[in-house]
Design a protein with these regions (language model features):
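Bacterial N-terminal signal peptides
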Residues: 4-16
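Flexible coil/turn and secondary-structure edge motifs
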Residues: 21-214
Length: 214
């Protein structure tokens, strides 16, 4: 019994030590509609949380109705013991249309353009590597820019976890939950169809919901 208790204690201490030394890191990406990017990354191993927001512009305290030159972005907090920056950038590229310079799918304009933010020289090099590998696979130029450190402004509360909200809203199809409205929007916008057309078998690699529909 003494040996069993000792082993249990050792395992407990080891687990606690590992948890204490797990480092949470962040990645900020712009991929068009932030509801969609948030959902995709909340279905990726190692991601702790994905938060919708705004970045890349000059306006302080942007809002959905007034965000100036900001893009819709998502801040992805991840456990660096489980995944890493390069892996997440690889996944991101395969969830968007990296050949579109003017927006994403049915959403057009600066707000919906893609971007990857690198906060360190190491992250910049990793992002450049991911883009080069993506271009080699596609045989096309990836127009998604890699930009530097940026201030992240969190979006309004109603945008967070929009894809799974049960709150009702009135749409042209009648009263729907936000989750239902989100699914209709995503399908009508052609997001998944275009990503699969572009990336083929690599589309949504690493995103667990991709096999079940979005």
């Amino acid at each position: 019994m003494f040996r069993a208790l000792s082993l249990a204690s050792v395992l407990s201490i080891t687990a606690a030590f590992g948890a204490a030394h797990a480092e949470t890191k962040s990645l900020i990406v712009a991929g068009g509609c932030f509801w969609c990017v948030e959902k995709d990354f909340e279905h990726v191993d190692g991601v702790i949380e994905a938060t919708s927001g705004y970045a890349g512009g000059e306006l302080s305290d942007p809002t959905y109705r007034n965000h100036g030159r900001h893009r819709e972005v998502v801040k992805i907090d991840y456990d660096s013991n489980v995944t890493d920056y390069k892996t997440l950038v690889d996944i991101f590229l395969r969830t968007v249309d990296v050949t579109d310079p003017g927006g994403q799918f049915c959403d057009r304009g600066r707000s919906y353009e893609t971007a990857i933010h690198a906060f360190t020289p190491e992250e910049m090099a990793l992002a450049e590597q991911a883009v080069a590998e993506g271009e080699a696979y596609l045989g096309q130029t990836i127009v998604t820019p890699i930009e530097g450190e940026v201030t992240f402004w969190i979006a309004e509360e109603y945008h967070q976890n929009y894809y799974k909200s049960e709150e009702l809203r009135l749409t042209r199809f009648g009263a729907l939950t936000r989750a239902q409205a989100y699914l209709q929007y995503r399908k009508a916008c052609g997001r998944d169809a275009r990503v699969k057309q572009l990336w083929g078998d690599e589309a949504y690699t690493g995103v667990s919901h991709a096999q079940k529909g979005s």
